[in-house]
Amino acid sequence: MNQIEKTGELTSSRFTVRDFTELVKIGIVNSNTITAFTGMWLAFQLNGISFIQNVDVIFFTIVGSALIVAASGAFNNVIDRDIDGIMERTKNRPTMTGKISGKRALMVALVLGVVGTIMLFMTTWQAGVLGVIGVFLYVVVYSLYAKRKLVSNTVIGSFSGAVPPLIGWFAVEPSFSIVPIMLFLVMFCWQPPHFYAIAIKRKEEYAAAGIPMLPVVKGIERTKKSMFFWVILLTVLPFFMFDLGLVYVILATLLNIGWLALSIYGFKMDDSIKWAKWMFVYSLNYMTILFVAMVVISIFL
């Protein structure tokens, strides 16, 4: 490992758009922004609130959510510089190649976090507080502590990943109902099987980096059982979401049955890595279809 990989020292003043998107983990930003949008959209649709007359709320919610998620990703990159160089999938992050120094990455994270939080508070104080809680859970509780110390790190990290749809809902309708609670639970239960699939594929890398992921500590078979458990929990949730109509409940149930069948097949399949890839791909398609369906179906309610 060279000096750049160890410290992330800046070797070039060039800071490209690609470097920025890698720093903030743009894929995670996009997916979380979609869930925040869905929460916001459903709050408009199910509460009879005008979408057109609240363009400012839409703007502040979407951009604010994207910025705090981006800030969290940048903070995580700064924190993980000591282990990113060990793992194949993270060794080319700009904080490791020297394109972005740790100091600059930290400044970017702080600016994004502050601006994003201010924007969320410009919708409702509930949305702003949820944004702060989400960043704290991901950066402090997960990245600084749980990820490195606890085998339950993935489950703990799922709390922060389930916050964006709550932000979207409470930015529009600052009161509790069953829908935002179910959105939170869908995101919370979806993340363990999704990230455990990655952990199975990257088991040796996590072991080398000293990260106590479930497959590393308890083994792949134990991880398969845990993934099966979380998918079972997902199968229950649609039956608490009849506010979105029977079509949604049927669609979500069919998606859950498919994922459940794939989970069960994993106990019979010898090639666990190949199975984990299938689980990972299914999880991505599952979340995309589910949240797009929520938006589309709600239009006709």
Curated annotation (Swiss-Prot):
**Can you cite a GO biological process for this protein?**
heme O biosynthetic process
Return the EC number.
Answer: 2.5.1.141
The reaction(s) annotated as catalysed by this protein in its Swiss-Prot or TrEMBL entry are:
heme b + (2E,6E)-farnesyl diphosphate + H2O = Fe(II)-heme o + diphosphate
Q: What pathway does this protein act in?
A: Porphyrin-containing compound metabolism; heme O biosynthesis; heme O from protoheme: step 1/1
Recorded GO molecular functions are: protoheme IX farnesyltransferase activity
Question: Per the UniProt record, which residue ranges are transmembrane?
Answer: 20-42, 55-75, 105-125, 126-146, 150-172, 176-198, 227-247, 249-269, 280-300
Q: Name one GO cellular component term.
A: plasma membrane
- How would you describe this protein's topology in the membrane? Multi-pass membrane protein
Keyword Ligase on entry: no
Q: Which domain of life is it from?
A: Bacteria
- Which Pfam family is an annotated match for this chain, by its short name? UbiA
InterPro entries, sorted: Protohaem_IX_farnesylTrfase, UbiA_prenyltransferase, UbiA_prenylTrfase_CS, UbiA_sf
Q: Which residues form a coiled coil?
A: none
Q: What HAMAP family does the entry give? A: CyoE_CtaB (MF_00154)
The record's note on quaternary structure and interaction partners says: Interacts with CtaA.
Function, as annotated, reads: Converts heme B (protoheme IX) to heme O by substitution of the vinyl group on carbon 2 of heme B porphyrin ring with a hydroxyethyl farnesyl side group.
Q: What else is known?
A: Carbon 2 of the heme B porphyrin ring is defined according to the Fischer nomenclature.
Protein name per the record: Protoheme IX farnesyltransferase
Question: What is the species of this protein?
Answer: Listeria innocua serovar 6a (strain ATCC BAA-680 / CLIP 11262)
Per UniProt, what is the name of the gene that codes for the protein in this document? ctaB
